[in-house]
Amino acid sequence: MNKENHSLIAEFILTGFTYHPKLKTVLFVVFFAIYLITMVGNIGLVALIYIEQRLHTPMYIFLGNLVLMDSCCSSAITPKMLENFFSEDKRITLYECMAQFYFLCLAETTDCFLLAAMAYDCYVAICNPLQYHTMMSKTLCIQMTAGAYLAGNLHPMIEVEFLLRLTFCGSHQINHFFCDVLPLYRLSCINPYINELVLFILAGSIQIFTIVLVSYFYILFTIFTMKSKEGRGKALSTCASHFLSVSIFCDSLLFMYARPGAVNEGDKDIPVAIFYTLVIPLLNPFIYSLRNKEVINIMKKIMKKRKFCHILKQMSSPLAT
C-alpha cells in the first residue's frame, strides 16, 4: 500500500541537456527557433489546405492532419523543455509526466497511421489512376482519418495504463528532456519486463503496418515498368516526398523503441529523441511543400495577390488625401 501511495504522489526532475550557462543559452535559442519555425510552417500549411479548394483532396487532407499532429508532438514537449533551461524548479508531477507522454504518443501513433493512409493513396494514384476517384472516395478518406485518430488514442491509453502500474523510487531524476517511457522504466522499483514487452509488440506492429511493404512494392514496380520517362518522373516526384518522410520517421521510431535492450542504454537515445520529436516535425512541411509544384504554385499566387493588394493600397492612399 505504501508503495502505491508513493507512486501516486511521485514527482520527477527533468535534468534536460546541460547545466552549463553558455551552452544553455545557445540551446535555448536553437530549440526556440526550431519550435517557432515548426509551428509557423505546420499551421501555415494546415491553413493553406483549409482555405484553398484545390487542395481538398485525400492526399492533402491526410497531409493536413499529419502536420497538425506534428504540431501537437512539438507542443507536448518543447514549452516545458524551454522553461527548464532557466528554471530552478525542474520538477514535474507523475500525472503531468503521464499527460506529456500521452500526447506525444498520440501524435506519433496517429502519424504512423496517417502515413499508412497516404501510402495507400499514393498506391491507388500510381497503380490504379483510372479508378482513383472510386477507390479513394471522400467517405473512405474521412473514415481512414477518423480511424487514424482512434488507433492513435488506443496506443497511449494502453502505455499509460501499464506505466501507472509501476512503482518509482530512487533519485526521481529523469535523464532526459521530456517524460519518455524508456527513462521511466529505468526509475522503476519493479522489473518493467511486461511494459517493455507491450512497448515492443505495439511499436513493432504499428511500424510494420505503417511501412506498408506491399504498397511500396507495387508502387515501385508500376513506376519502373512505365514506358514513358515523363510519366515515370512525374510518378516518382508524386511519391518521393512520402517515401522520404516515411523512411525517416519509421526508421527513427524503430531504432528508438523496437530494438532489444533499448531500456539499458541510458541517455544514448537522446539524439534520436531530438530527431523524431523536434527535427522531423520541422522538416515535414518543407519536405511536402518544396517538392510539390501544386502547393508552390498556390503559394506564389497568394503572394502575388498580396503584392497586388499592397500596391492598390499605396495607390489609393494619395487619392484619398
From Swiss-Prot:
Membrane topology: Multi-pass membrane protein
Keywords from the named record: Cell membrane, Disulfide bond, G-protein coupled receptor, Glycoprotein, Membrane, Olfaction, Receptor, Sensory transduction, Transducer, Transmembrane, Transmembrane helix
Glycosylation sites: N5
Protein location: Cell membrane
Record-linked SUPFAM superfamilies: Family A G protein-coupled receptor-like
One GO term describing the cellular component: plasma membrane
Superkingdom as given in the UniProt entry: Eukaryota
Keyword field contains Transmembrane helix: yes
Disulfide topology: C97-C179
InterPro entries listed in its UniProt record: GPCR_Rhodpsn, GPCR_Rhodpsn_7TM, Olfact_rcpt
PROSITE patterns xrefs: G_PROTEIN_RECEP_F1_2 (PS50262)
Spans within the Cytoplasmic topological domain: 47-56, 119-143, 218-235, 291-321
Coiled-coil segments on the chain, per record: none
Record-stated family: Belongs to the G-protein coupled receptor 1 family.
General function of this protein: Odorant receptor.
Record-given protein name: Olfactory receptor 5K3
Gene (name only): OR5K3
